[in-house]
């Protein structure tokens, strides 16, 4: 049994004085931790980092290159504008009007600019004439609807085919044969265009009057939504009769407005002296033909 002052095995054998000289401190003989190997004190500054740097002056060169490209494009656009202006001026001197398609705006099909190309005192009349063209389109389209109902009720497919033919021939025909000549006549005061308009607008009015009545000449008249077929089918098929009566009203309205338009155009034509010009042109043409 050990004594009171037996040596404690957990005590360090060498006592260290903390106030002793640091240079004379003995190394711990019983240290259980091995010191870490020394690390180089480079702090990462020794590694080379590749940073892509542009060459001096390359940014300025790119800017100059882009500036030259923009100047070249600008010069090309200016040259094209000048060429287009020269062509337009030459066409204007020759009496040729370049008609760019601008109507309808969502899908341009025709050139139409009453506000900028027609005289102010004639714009109202031109707008009403344009309304008669749109009225013809509406009447022919409704005619297809009315005849389609009659076909469904057992009237036969032939009248429907005729109604479609009226539409696909009347819509472009009305524009080419009488509306565009009137537009050009008001724009350039051309006696020839006035004469062309009067001829085919009269045929347009006669067709509308014929369609409003729809006499039983072709397939009992049921290919046109007029008053006579409306009365004929109303007792047996009320819906078809109502549709035909609506078509009759559209053709009547189209006829009345068209008669007013041709009267107003003729009054302007006589008052402007174009009638005399037309007679002189006709006499001159007859003289050339005789010679």
UniProtKB/Swiss-Prot annotation:
The chain crosses the membrane at residues 127-147, 159-179, 194-214, 242-262. The keyword Transport applies. Residues 1-10 have a biased composition (Basic and acidic residues). It is a multi-pass membrane protein. GO terms for cellular component: plasma membrane; transport vesicle membrane. Keywords: Cell membrane, Coiled coil, Cytoplasmic vesicle, Membrane, Phosphoprotein, Transmembrane, Transmembrane helix, Transport. It is found in: Cell membrane; Cytoplasmic vesicle, Secretory vesicle membrane. One of its GO terms (biological process) is protein transport. Residues 1-126, 263-288 are cytoplasmic. Residues 58-94 form a coiled coil. Its main location: membrane. InterPro entries: SCAMP. Probably involved in membrane trafficking. Belongs to the SCAMP family. This is Secretory carrier-associated membrane protein 5. It comes from Arabidopsis thaliana.
